[in-house]
Amino acid sequence: MVANNGTADALVAALKRKGGIQMTVLPLYNVMLIPETNLYLQTQAFTAMTGKEPENQDRLIIAAEKSPKKREEITEDDLYPIGVSGIITEINSDNNYIVIRTKKRADITDITIFADHTINVTATKREDTPGEDIDPDDERARLDKLKQALVGYFSNSQWGSASRGYIAQFGSISEIAAAMSPWLFNSAEDRYKVLEEDSKAKRLDLMEKMIYENIEMSNIGTEAANAQEADYQKIYRESALKKQID
């Protein structure tokens, strides 16, 4: 639904009467949205997609875009029906990036796009599969194995020794998937399939499989792997920054 400015004012008033909470809607493309991880974003990218400057402790609904579109081009059909809630925990003015701590998955309905291209949605917490436990020892073993695979992947690069320290900082497979998300070969639809999976165990399986497949695809040709090296350097630099911030 598209609303004019008068409708927007009326909607805000209605939300206040109902005790609703205004949250900034942030549409993102080519980012795997994962609960309970840190998401790094350039400040100008946040402003471009929300029409506002970031504020510390801003509460967000992050919506996954089906295709890359500018804020002015987005319609309600361009957003997937599941996103994640989040909060801005850090604004780094020196390096022009922000840190968003993602929270819970959310069902997104009642999408309204105003004349100024800001977006309002109804967001409802989406529950995970109840009664599901993940063996922490198994999860740790799988994380360690994946880290070793990443170390091996970068071992022949010019910064192979330095990458060990960055890789060691990851505390979960989710963190690795979130950091590598922009450089994975997978489509927006593939990334969304991880988010829409209600089982935490199956989400872990999907993320793990996706990362291994991308390592294998990158290893097929040395030329292709080298072409991506600069991008992966950026990933691990941001990971190092994350640990300094935390």
Give short role names for the model-derived ranges.
Residues V2-D246:
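N-terminal low-complexity, acidic/polar interaction/targeting segments
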